[in-house]
Design a protein with these regions (language model features):
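Short, low-structural-confidence N-terminal segments
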Residues: 1-73
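Short domain-boundary/entry signatures in modular proteins, especially
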Residues: 13-16, 87, 169
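Charged, solvent-exposed helices and adjacent loops that form client-binding or oligomerization surfaces
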Residues: 40-80, 84, 96-169
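A generic alpha-helix surface/boundary motif
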Residues: 88-89, 93
């Protein structure tokens, strides 16, 4: 099981490398953003019958995945998280090396992200953006970490779109 109590999340544990792509490293500190994004994507895709596929009242490491009965749901989402990290990281690194810049709309979104999350946190009664993010991404989540995650995702997505649009057929 990958599950650990919040008290066990020391800097040493959070800084352990779990995957790499080129010169980039994924640590336990950033893995939850990718992990929970896998779950949220799954929940969105299968929202009509999500309740029949996974029991959200039980830990994911105690339920077998309906798509692959050799994996728990936790293992399934972890595999997806690492795979997504590698794809995002490869595109993000290539974008940086090529001098790619986010478009104005994406950059504006990124620039306003901290304020957007802070306002959402306050509207739901959380004392801070970090506290709000920790309910969605786990006890080590921070606004800085989330911002970095979103910046990578946006850059990778926009860069891939630019590559596709530049292709001639």
């Amino acid at each position: 099981s990958y599950t650990v109590d919040a008290e066990a999340l020391t800097d040493e544990v959070l800084d352990l490398e779990v995957a790499s792509c080129g010169d980039d490293r994924l640590t336990n500190r950033d893995l939850p953003y990718y992990y929970w994004q896998q779950y949220y994507s799954f929940a969105s895709t299968y929202s009509s019958y999500d309740a029949y596929l996974i029991d959200t009242t039980k830990p994911f490491d105690q339920q077998m995945c309906v798509f692959d009965d050799t994996l728990t749901w936790q293992q399934y989402f972890l595999q997806g998280a690492v795979s997504t990290y590698k794809s995002v990281s490869a595109l993000w690194q290539d974008a940086r090396l090529s001098g790619f810049q986010l478009g104005e709309e994406d950059q504006d979104y990124l620039d306003g992200l901290s304020n957007t999350v802070t306002v959402s946190a306050a509207s739901y009664g959380y004392e801070s953006a970090d506290a709000y993010l920790q309910t969605a991404y786990g006890p080590a989540a921070t606004m800085t970490g989330y911002h970095d995650f979103v910046e990578r995702y946006l850059t990778a997505s926009a860069y891939l779109q630019a590559l596709v649009e530049a292709k001639t057929y």
